């Protein structure tokens, strides 16, 4: 059985009382947000929980019940992009935030997790304020999830997401830089192993 939307994604629902960072409404599509704009690869979406602090245990119990019913579990894995304000507040010790060690002075580097538009602020061609008091700011701008490598995504782009960098330089003929192994590969392997440890049976990869 395919359980969609399990991993925590950007939302306009306020969960600050549970120490979950809020998302700027300008970069969330709709009130509930898109389940493909992941904001924390290591957490369960709190909208699905009966008991928000115990949401991971609830998911583990769901997996156990599914197996007892003779079914197997697959969940979505979204490797192409993440929410613009991605930040994991549940990642295990010994792991590093996506982008934490990036050098944003380079539009592309195989050592970066994101692609950047150096020295450029994001100038989205959509409402950059939403219902917030201040507009959303991003400097330097990151490339948008649907391969938009400029600072001007519009309403028809996946503007709520940023593209992940697996060592492919799209702006220079798609040249591949796979040796040494790009850092994003290692981080994604850690994420896949984390969810595999929850006894799921497979992933549906959404690109």
For each feature predicted by the language model, list its residue ranges:
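Substrate-binding/active-site clefts of carbohydrate-active enzymes
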Residues: 5-194, 198
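Surface-exposed extracellular loop regions of Gram-negative outer-membrane beta-barrel proteins
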Residues: 193, 203-204
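Conserved beta-strand positions in the central sheet of alpha/beta enzyme cores
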Residues: 2, 74, 204-206
């Amino acid at each position: 059985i395919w359980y969609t939307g399990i991993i925590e994604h950007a939302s306009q629902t306020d969960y600050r009382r549970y120490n979950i960072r809020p998302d700027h409404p300008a970069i969330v599509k709709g009130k509930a947000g898109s389940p493909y704009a992941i904001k924390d690869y290591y957490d369960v979406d709190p909208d699905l929980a009966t008991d928000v602090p115990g949401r991971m245990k609830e998911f583990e119990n769901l997996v156990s019940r599914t197996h007892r019913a003779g079914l197997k579990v697959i969940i979505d894995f979204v490797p192409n992009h993440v929410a613009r304000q991605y930040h994991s507040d549940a990642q295990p010790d010994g792991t590093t935030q996506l982008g934490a060690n990036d050098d944003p002075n380079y539009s592309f580097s195989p050592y970066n997790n994101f692609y950047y538009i150096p020295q450029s602020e994001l100038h989205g061609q959509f409402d950059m304020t939403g219902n917030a008091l201040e507009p959303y700011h991003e400097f330097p701008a990151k490339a948008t999830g649907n391969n938009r490598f400029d600072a001007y995504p519009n309403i028809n782009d996946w503007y709520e997401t940023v593209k992940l960098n697996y060592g492919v330089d799209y702006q220079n003929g798609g040249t591949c830089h796979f040796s040494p192994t790009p850092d994003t590969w290692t981080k994604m392997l850690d994420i896949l192993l984390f969810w595999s440890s929850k006894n799921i049976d497979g992933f549906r990869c959404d690109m």
